[in-house]
Every structure is written in C-alpha cells, then in structure tokens.
C-alpha cells in the first residue's frame, strides 16, 4: 500500500511553497527547537519502508524531526520545487541522467567530508563519477541500494532437466535450443511497453561496450555505430527464442506468463521479482548474468545505483543531515530495505541477499559490475522506442539504419552538452 502523502500533487506543493519559505526554508527549525530534515525520495514502492524509518528515527532522536516524502511522481515534483527554490534537505534518487543534470546545475552539496562514505563499495562510487558530464572534484551522493539485471530463470525447471547456467553467448544459444527441443518456451518479453526493450539491451551492452561510451562519444573519440553493432545484433537475436509477437505483450503480461511457467527464462531486472511473486508466491526464481561475450572472463553484471542520497547544496543543517544519513546506513536499516525490495546494498558488509540473486552473488561480492548504459541517455531521445522500432524492422539494412539514427539523434539531443564537454577538454588538455 502506498503511503498517504503529506502533499499529493505538484499544485499542492506550489501552494505551500511560500509558507515553507517563510519558515526559513531548508531544514527549518520547529517551535520546539528541533531541526527538521526533509527527504524526498523517488521510490513510491518503498514508501512503507520509509514510513518505518521515519518513525524509528524520530522515536530515537530528540533534537531532529525527520520527514520522508515518497510521492508517486517524485522527479516531476522535485523539478517543480527546484524552479521555485523550495528545496528539501536530502533527495533520494537513482544514479541516472537526472542525477547528472542536478549535479551539472550545482544543486548538490559536496559531501566528501562525510565519514559514512568509507563504508560504501568503491564500485558504486565510481559509477557515480562516470555520471559526471565533466570531471568534478568531490562526492555528491551516498550510493545506498543497487539493482541487478540479467536473466531470471525458473530454478525448478532447470533442475528437472539438468540444465546448467550458460557462461558464454554460444552456451546461451545452445541452452535456448535445448529448451525449445524440450517443448518449452525459452524467453518471454513484454516489448509492448517500450521501456522493457532496454532490459536485454543494457545487460548485453555492459559486456560488449565501454562503460564510459557516452562520455567518449561526447568527447568526439568514437561513435555509437562503432560500438553498438554487436549489442544491437545480439539483442535482436534473442527474438529467435521469444514467444510469438513479443510486441503484443506488456511488462505485466510477461511477469504473469513467467510466473505461470509459460517461459523458462525472463531477461529483466531484479525489480520484476515482487510482481512475479504476486502471481505465484511459490515460484523458485534464481538469476544469472547475461553472457553476451564468448569469453566468460568478460562477463559483467549489469548493476547501477538504484537509490542514492544527496544533500542539497543550500541545506542549512549539514550536521543533522549527516546524522540522518548515518541512521540510513545502520546495518539494520540497510538489511530491512534489502528484505523489503530485494535490493543489492552499496554498503560493505555481511548482508543477506534475496535467494533469487544467488547466481549473481559472486559478481556483487567481487564488484564485477557495470552501470546501465541507459542511465546516460537523455529521456527525450527515447532510446527505448528506438530499440523497439529497430527490433520490429525486418529489412536487410535495419541495423545500419538504427546505428546511424542513434548517432544522429545523440547529437540532436546533446548538442549543448557535447559543446560543453569539448570546451572543457580544450581547457584541460591533460585530463584523460
């Protein structure tokens, strides 16, 4: 059940913005002398968890009142509030293009002095650095939870047939053929919802393309056509093992079909598991890394910062904000989130992961992960729709057309950013 919001619409937020400013804005003190710290976080599915965190924190802290809002359309609400200069103290968002834009707009505080960063896995801190449009000194977010994407599979069916986890592209294709020969459906897709086209695309690209490819393109060092051909061809190749007309079925349809045993595998992220389990609570799910290369040593887990916390640059109560972050990073609080959301912790520690991540555990523990390529794509470019169009195109030159369009559209939607990056490189010729 979603939390009953204190302010349920952007209009309501705007109506109260003036009053909030009158109360001296970010981190306003209350009549009882407490400092109020407000968090706005973007995952409404975790609202109940954050309600509990808020209650636990406030029951154990006499000098700080914590308010956590989990609105349904948090990014729109946050952007509206930023325009009105009505800032929360802390925001909880994903490590994606929105984070890059907020950072580029100088909205976030450098928290390099926050001691809690010492407990965060370097891999996820490095992922945030790759989201910077140009290199910046400092640290601007605390990675909290990651997710993982590859291939979910029905463990019971695998065990029944004696199938083993593929570690190369050829082994994956051979497995799919074995599944078909057994009269079963290898994959199910919900490509009617265009965003789901990014799931296999991202999982394949982390093996075959540089993690900083978008930055390389912005610097004029390469093109997508030079790097994405194999990614595109292998994403298309998965259709050979999909159900008939995967573009007629939605994400919900695919989750339901997999839950009911209509397919043995589902190329999607760990975020799909709760919905699958709603349909079939008894399904025995595990997962494995997408083996897009024929060199098993090159396999990388597709994992990014699903939730991270940034202190706003104008927060007046940095010490209290850090105290809230300390509470969020307590082992008990972290484990509670893992249990609630089947997440991957960005914090070092001996945490118990969901069983459906067993097949990815070694990659998580070794930090052998790479971020989602689409975290660098501007939303207005609609890469998901471009991929869907490509997958529907059965012409001989479909891949060439797609790759040419990708490069053209990238320049169209990133013209100002490309100019900024290249100006920076001219001013800093020694920066790699």
Residue ranges and their predicted role:
Residues 159, 335, 366-432:
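Conserved C-terminal helix/tail region of periplasmic/extracytoplasmic solute-binding proteins
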Residues 134-144, 149, 173-220, 263:
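Extracytoplasmic/periplasmic solute-binding protein
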Residues 178, 217-247:
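Glycine-centered hinge/linker elements that transmit conformational signals in sensory
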Residues 59, 161, 233, 240, ...:
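Extracytoplasmic/periplasmic substrate-recognition and gating elements
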Residues 56, 107-110, 271-275, 307-381, ...:
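Mature extracytoplasmic/periplasmic domains
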Residues 80-81, 88-89, 118-156, 185-189, ...:
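A structural signal for short loop-to-beta-strand junctions that line the ligand-binding cleft
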Residues 56, 60-124, 156, 160-161, ...:
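Extracytoplasmic "Venus flytrap"/periplasmic binding protein-like
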Residues 94-149, 173, 179, 200-202, ...:
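Hinge/lid segment of periplasmic solute-binding proteins
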